[in-house]
């Protein structure tokens, strides 16, 4: 690996950022963090941000105390909870079984915005998981069965073989596997970040304390 070349690229990128030029958060946010999230999410969709429902999910392994992050997709926002789906045998699911605290990060560079959300995660009902799974493309349904997510794989041919076997096994409807389903994150903290000129970015936080939301700002 040519680390010198990589270093050159990093050096060139250090100052290769356009200045931020958006108004202060006071003009953009509601006092209700859920309404503010929906407003920003809708704007990200309307402005054609690339994959606006993509977010980084961070969990922690309690044995090693090692944080782990990966990109997922938000699939629903209901009852003031954010819903995503995964394999219940995956590393993230194993970590969530022992530590239900997790953090989401949405980033929309075109709008110069990001939202960090900390919360407590729980599994959604089997009915909700069934309903979402049935809406997925058949290829994705087969893929959910075929992937032994987070387990070591000797060859990509192994999983391709499983896919062919499963396509034959499920010649018609594909049922949801018991090891696959949804999680819902109940927020206890929101941080809305808006880029501003001279790197004096706005950070407006909402923390759920004593059954109500407390709002405050943080230094950039």
What are these regions (language model features)?
Residues 1-220:
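Binding-site signature for planar aromatic cofactors or substrates
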């Amino acid at each position: 690996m040519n680390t010198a070349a990589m270093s050159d690229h990093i050096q060139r990128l250090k100052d290769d950022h356009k200045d931020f030029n958006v108004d202060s958060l006071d003009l953009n946010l509601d006092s209700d963090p859920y309404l503010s999230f929906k407003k920003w999410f809708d704007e990200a969709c309307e402005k054609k941000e690339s994959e606006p429902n993509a977010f980084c999910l961070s969990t922690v392994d309690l044995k090693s105390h090692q944080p782990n992050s990966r990109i997922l997709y938000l699939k629903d926002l209901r009852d003031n909870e954010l819903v995503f789906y995964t394999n219940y045998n995956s590393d993230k699911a194993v970590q969530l079984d022992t530590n239900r605290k997790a953090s989401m990060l949405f980033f929309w560079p075109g709008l110069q915005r990001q939202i960090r959300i900390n919360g407590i995660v729980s599994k959604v009902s089997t009915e909700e998981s069934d309903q979402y799974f049935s809406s997925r493309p058949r290829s994705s349904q087969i893929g959910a069965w075929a992937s032994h997510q987070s387990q070591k794989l000797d060859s990509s041919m192994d999983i391709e073989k499983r896919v062919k076997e499963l396509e034959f096994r499920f010649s018609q409807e594909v049922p949801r596997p018991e090891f696959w389903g949804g999680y819902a994150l109940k927020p206890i903290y929101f941080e809305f970040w808006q880029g501003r000129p001279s790197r004096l970015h706005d950070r407006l936080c909402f923390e759920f304390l004593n059954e109500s939301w407390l709002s405050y700002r943080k230094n950039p």
